[in-house]
Structure formats: C-alpha cells, structure tokens
Amino acid sequence: DLVRSRGLGDVYKRQVGENFYANVNLVILDGAKVRIGDNAFIAPNVGIYTAGHPLDASDRNKGLEYAYPITIGNNVWIGAGAIILPGVTIGNNVVIGAGSVVTKNIPAYSLAVGNPCRVIKRIDE
C-alpha cells in the first residue's frame, strides 16, 4: 500500500505494510520517505518526523530545513507518546517504550526505552 501526499509542490511517500495499526493522533511529517513494515502497531500520540531545522539561528531564519528517511521494520510496537526523529531505522521485532525519543537506529530484536531512547534488553528471536 503506497500513499502519496503533496506538500510545498513536492510529492513524498509513505509506505505501509500489511496488518498495520495506528491508534489516535499519529503524526507523520513526511519531508522524506517513511517506510513502516508488516505487523507494526503504533500507540496513541506518536510522532514520526523526517524533517528538522539547523541548530544555527541564522540558517533557521533563512528557512533552511533538512529531511532524512525513517524506516520502521516488521513486528514493531511503538508505545504511546513516542517520538521518532529524522534518519532513524528501527529494526524488525522491536518494542519502543512509551514516551521514548528515538534519535538513533535501534537494532532488531530489541526493547528500547527512554529519552534519548536506548536498548535495555534483547528480545529473543
């Protein structure tokens, strides 16, 4: 299933796998491609943001921004209120705890929590 959205004259894509479920208030800011795998479950109030702005105020004031793709693997559960930031890949069979801020890649078969999000346990294959 491929969904296209239009923004600022460009076409961006969100690709969603089979048996995907998202609860209320999911926000996907798709300045770059977002891929969500099969059997992915997303709790309420999750934000998936591909876009960001420079730290330097003069660059921000020029209207500069960046966007990096996000990939969420198969059999992933993302807890309520989690935030997924630009450029992140979440591997297959991962659980992201509620309220986590995912700033870096999370390897497959992991339980990851916190701000910033970090792996606290391996989930057996």
Walk through the language-model features, giving the residues of each.
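Single conserved hydrophobic/aromatic residue that forms the stacking wall/gate
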Residues: 1-12
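Conserved G/P- and acidic residue-centered "switch" motifs that form tight phosphate/ATP-binding loops
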Residues: 96, 114
